[in-house]
Swiss-Prot record:
GO terms for molecular function: structural constituent of ribosome. Keywords: Ribonucleoprotein, Ribosomal protein. Belongs to the bacterial ribosomal protein bL12 family. One of its GO terms (cellular component) is ribonucleoprotein complex. Homodimer. Part of the ribosomal stalk of the 50S ribosomal subunit. Forms a multimeric L10(L12)X complex, where L10 forms an elongated spine to which 2 to 4 L12 dimers bind in a sequential fashion. Binds GTP-bound translation factors. This is Large ribosomal subunit protein bL12. It comes from the Bacteria. One of its GO terms (biological process) is translation. SUPFAM superfamilies: Ribosomal protein L7/12, oligomerisation (N-terminal) domain. It comes from Clostridium pasteurianum. InterPro entries: Ribosomal_bL12_oligo, Ribosomal_bL12_oligo_N_sf. Forms part of the ribosomal stalk which helps the ribosome interact with GTP-bound translation factors. Is thus essential for accurate translation.
């Protein structure tokens, strides 16, 4: 899957789906996507 394909998939998602995607990525890689303050 290319970066372009990933971007196209994300563009078709709802805000709720994106939120769930971010949570899944955080859990998978043990990281947080929260911006440092």
């Amino acid at each position: 899957m290319s970066k372009e394909q990933i971007i196209q998939a994300i563009k078709g998602m709802t805000v709720l789906e994106l939120n769930e995607l971010v949570k899944s990525i955080e859990e998978e890689f043990g990281v947080s996507a929260a911006a440092p303050v």
